[in-house]
Amino acid sequence: MASVAAVLLAGALVVTLTEGSGQASGVTYVGGDNSQQVYAAGHRALAPDFTGTSLTGTPIRLASYRGKVVVLNFWGSWCAPCRAEGPTLAVLSQQYRSKGVSFLGDDVGDTTANALAFTRDIGIGYPSVNDASYSIVQDFSRVASVGYTPTTVVIDQTGHIAGLVIGKISYQSMTTILNDVTASR
């Protein structure tokens, strides 16, 4: 009887862990529910600082962006929703540059070659950190619901998490969050 219960429990765990995952051309991704959250100024968690290396070999440190709004997108070349949202993020990065908003990517689980091909194919011109070990994802998951790919975090000028989109972003969801955060300067 105990072994039957163990098998049922293991099956339920597999279903729970795979629920929300998507399948695209045989490549999996960790799907979110496309929810968005905006945090009031007094209720924002401090974003964890990180240091990493960009896909082109340049050092990147989040703290060096203090004083600017930062959009940090967690993505992978293997992720179909990441491919779908990439062109929108590229457009937004150009549109909000004059408003002092910087965009960064956190490439999770890719080789540098695959990640560079992704950014080239999608037209992403902003830097991305190679996070093959998922260490930045793990640090952010301690303070926000970062555990799905894609997830996009908006960090205010003081380094606090002002907004979060779990799953694929839309142009409207991001402009709403960015207009709110940039207006509160």
What are these model-predicted stretches?
Residues 74-76, 106-109, 131-132, 166-168:
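Active-site-proximal beta-strand/loop segments in catalytic clefts of secreted hydrolases
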Residues 83-122, 132-139:
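Structural microenvironment flanking redox-active thiols in thiol-disulfide oxidoreductases
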Residues 71-72, 103:
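Hydrophobic beta-strand anchors of alpha/beta hydrolase catalytic cores
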Residues 117-125, 131-185:
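Thiol/disulfide oxidoreductase modules built on the thioredoxin-like
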Residues 66, 74-91:
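Conserved redox-active cysteine motifs that mediate thiol-disulfide chemistry
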Residues 1-47, 185:
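N-terminal targeting signals for export/organelle localization
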Residues 41-44, 49-70:
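A short beta-strand-turn-helix
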